[in-house]
Every structure is written in structure tokens, then in C-alpha cells.
Curated annotation (Swiss-Prot):
Catalytic activity: L-threonine + hydrogencarbonate + ATP = L-threonylcarbamoyladenylate + diphosphate + H2O
UniProt record, GO biological process: regulation of translational fidelity; tRNA threonylcarbamoyladenosine modification
Source species of the chain: Pseudomonas putida (strain W619)
Protein name: Threonylcarbamoyl-AMP synthase
Enzyme class: transferase
Domain of life: Bacteria
GO MF: ATP binding; double-stranded RNA binding; L-threonylcarbamoyladenylate synthase; tRNA binding
Species classification: Bacteria, Pseudomonadati, Pseudomonadota, Gammaproteobacteria, Pseudomonadales
Amino acid sequence: MVSSWRVQQAAREIRAGAVIAYPTEAVWGLGCDPWNEDAVYRLLALKSRPVDKGLILVADNIRQFDFLFEDFPEDWIDRMGSTWPGPNTWLVPHQDLLPEWVTGQHDTVALRVSDHPQVRELCALVGPLISTSCNPGGRPAAKSRLRVEQYFHGDLDMVLGGALGGRKNPSVIRNLATGEIVRPG
């Protein structure tokens, strides 16, 4: 895959510990490297979000999450795979394979394989990313680059331009083990 110059620049920034904003399927997102503790805590501070709530990981394809699936029943993997890429987020057991600054106080972690072209390009270059709505706590998620700038006044390392994917609502969130819908889409 040949990535655009701006996506390559965003990948370099993320590898260096940046927190960036980028368009997703429905709203603008904030993202960073999930393994970079400083970057994740900076993102949480920007949002005024407590670490115990946990965060979503977004990827280019299901294989980027293979390290989590070693002991999963095959039907779980098939269930997720049949809904990806797309607006479906699954809560899956993390088996202590992810840091607590990603999982919060939960035994599960939220995973999604995006169908947004820029998000997929970016994840193809850097692997799974933290992806959370671009807004300070209690405010509506940004639906425009202007709103991103108004919310964060230059506190982000980069804003990756582009268009939203056209969805009206964020992804549905389901518990993989129970099938329960935790958040409708």
C-alpha cells in the first residue's frame, strides 16, 4: 500500500510519541501509540478522561490483534471478522496483555477494525492505535476540523486532514462473550 505523504508524516509523529487528531467514520478521533504511556496519559489529560475508563484500539485488519486472540474460541474470531472492517467495536478479554492505561479497570478491551481509508492507512504503518472521540470530557465529539482546533487550541502534535466517513453515529459496542450491546451505533 502506498500511503499519502500526510499519513506517513502522521505515522512518524505517532512513533515519536505524538497525540494526533484524525477523521474517522463518524466523528474526529484522537489517537496515539497504545504502548507509549506518556502519549496515552497526555491524550487522557487533553480529554479530561479518567484512566480507569479504558480506551478503544483501532486497527487496519483483524491480524493486528492476533496477540490477543491466542486462547479465543474460533467462533469469537469469526464473529468479529464478519463485522470488520466496519462500525463495530467488540469488548474482548485482554488477558493482561495490554497496559492498564489502555484497559482501565476492565477485564476487557474495546477493539475495532476501521473502514475509514486514512485510519486504515495509518494503522497499516504503525499498528493498532488508541482511538477516542476528539472532544474534552462532557462536550460533543468534533465533527469538523474547525471544532478540533477550537477544542484543543494547538495542544495536539498534528491534525491529519481529511473527510469524515459519512456515518451519523459512532460504532456500536458489543461484548464478545455475551453478545450484549453496550452502546448502540
